[in-house]
Amino acid sequence: MSADWSYLREKSASRLAPSMAKDHPNLPVVKEEGCYYYGVDGVKYLDFTSGIAVTNVGHRHPKIVQAIKEAADHLTHGPIGVIQYESILKLADELADILPGDLDCFFFANSGTEAIEGALKLAKFVTKRPYVVSFTGCFHGRTQGSLGVSTSKSKYRKFLQPNGLTYQVPYFKPSDPRILDEEGEVVESLACELLEEEFTNLFKYHVSSEEVAAVILEPVLGEGGYIIPPASWLAKVREICNRHDILLIFDEVQTGFGRTGEWFAAQTFGVTPDIMAIAKGIASGLPLSATVANHKLMQQWPLGSHGTTFGGNPIACSAALATLDVLKEENLLDNAREVGAYARERLNLLKEKYEMIGSIRSVGLMIGIEIIDPQTKKPDGAAVLRILDLALQEGVLFYLCGNEGEVIRMIPPLSVTKEQIDDGLDMLQRALVKYKEETHQPASL
C-alpha cells in the first residue's frame, strides 16, 4: 500500500461517516474488471458481490465504458423536463419491452430508496388512501418514507420515528412449523392459508382494507436473508390485493436485471405488480433508478406531484442502454440460470461436509448461504464475519445479509463462469476449514 493510501486509510474514520468507513470489509482497490477487483496490495480478488448486485454485466464492461465516454461528449446533465434528450426516451421504450405485463411508464430517479419513495407517493396519490402494508424482514431503503416500510433490522429505524401510516404482516418463513409437513417440508397451501389469515386479522383488528393504498414487498427477501417464497405465496398476495382494490408494489431494486434468471423476479414467479421500483443493476454502477407503473396509473400523478433534479441523467441513461444490450447480446439471463444451478449443486456438496452450513437459498445468481452454530443450530452472524475475512484472505469477496448477519450473500456478476464459481467456492471451502481449526470444531462438523 502506498504512503498516500495509508494516510488516507488512517483518515477515513474521521472523514467518512461510520456507515461508510466501518462497513465490511472496506477493501482498498485501485481497479475493477469483469469479475475481479484489483487491490492496492497488488492482489487480484474474485468478486462475488457485484457492488451489491449492481454490476450485473461485470465490472467496467468495455461497452458500458464506451457508452459513458460518448455520452459525456454531448450531455452531462438534464434536467429532464427543462430539456429532453434521446437516451432517456429510448431507455423508457426499451425498458417497457422487457418489463412484465403493462408496466410501461417511468419516473426516473437516482437510487433504490428514491424509487421506493416514488412508488409509495404514487400509490397514495392515485388511491387517495393513507396506509401501506409491508412485510416483516423486508428492506426498502433508509429515507423517511422507505424506512417506514423497512423492518429488516430495528437499528435502521432507531430514533427516527418513521411515519405511523404503515402496518406489517410476516413474510414467508420456510421454518415456520405451521406450514411444514411431517418430513419438515413446506406445504405451499398451508403457507397461503396462513398468509390469508394474517391479512384477515390485519384488516379486522388494525386497519380497514378500504384505507390501504398499497402492499409492498421484495419478491425475494434481500437484506433480510435471501428468503425465497413459493410462487403460489406471491400469487396469494396478488389475489388479496385484487380482492380489496389495493395496489401491489414490487421492490425489484436487488432482484432486477437478470439476477433471478429472468429480467425481473416478477417474471420468475409469474406475478405482476401494479407498481415496481427498479435500480441497482440498471446502469452498471451509475446512479439511476425508476418508479414504474402502467400508463393509465402514472398519468393520474400530475405535473408537480413529484420531481427530480438529477434523475434520469443522460450519461446514466446511456450506460443503462448499453447494459441492456450486453445482457441481451451475451445471453446473461441464460447464464444466470445455468451457472446459478451449478453453484447451488456445489454448495449442496459443501453443506453435506460442513454442519455449520444451514440452508442454501438460491434463485438464478441470487444466492444465500446460511451459517449456523453446529451445536445449537442457531444463526451465527459472528461466524459469518470471520469466514468472510478468511475468504478474503484466500482471494474472494463475499457480502452478508440476514437479521443477525448470518447469511453469506453470493451475488457474482451474471457473466461469471463455472470455472470462476469453482475458484470462489474452493476459496470459501478453505476459509471454512480455517474457521473450524480456529474454533476447534470436531472434524465431523
From Swiss-Prot:
Keywords carried by this UniProt record: Aminotransferase, Pyridoxal phosphate, Transferase
Annotated PANTHER family: AMINOTRANSFERASE CLASS III
Cofactor names: pyridoxal 5'-phosphate
UniProt-listed Enzyme Commission number(s): 2.6.-.-
Transferase keyword on record: yes
InterPro entries: Aminotrans_3, Aminotrans_3_PPA_site, Class-III_PLP-dep_AT, PyrdxlP-dep_Trfase, PyrdxlP-dep_Trfase_major, PyrdxlP-dep_Trfase_small
Record flagged with keyword Transferase: yes
Gene Ontology molecular function terms on file: identical protein binding; pyridoxal phosphate binding; transaminase activity
Modified residues (N6-(pyridoxal phosphate)lysine): 280
Similarity comment text for this entry: Belongs to the class-III pyridoxal-phosphate-dependent aminotransferase family.
Class of the enzyme per the UniProt entry, highest EC level: transferase
Source organism of the structure: Alkalihalophilus pseudofirmus (strain ATCC BAA-2126 / JCM 17055 / OF4) (Bacillus pseudofirmus)
Name of this chain's protein: Uncharacterized aminotransferase BpOF4_10225
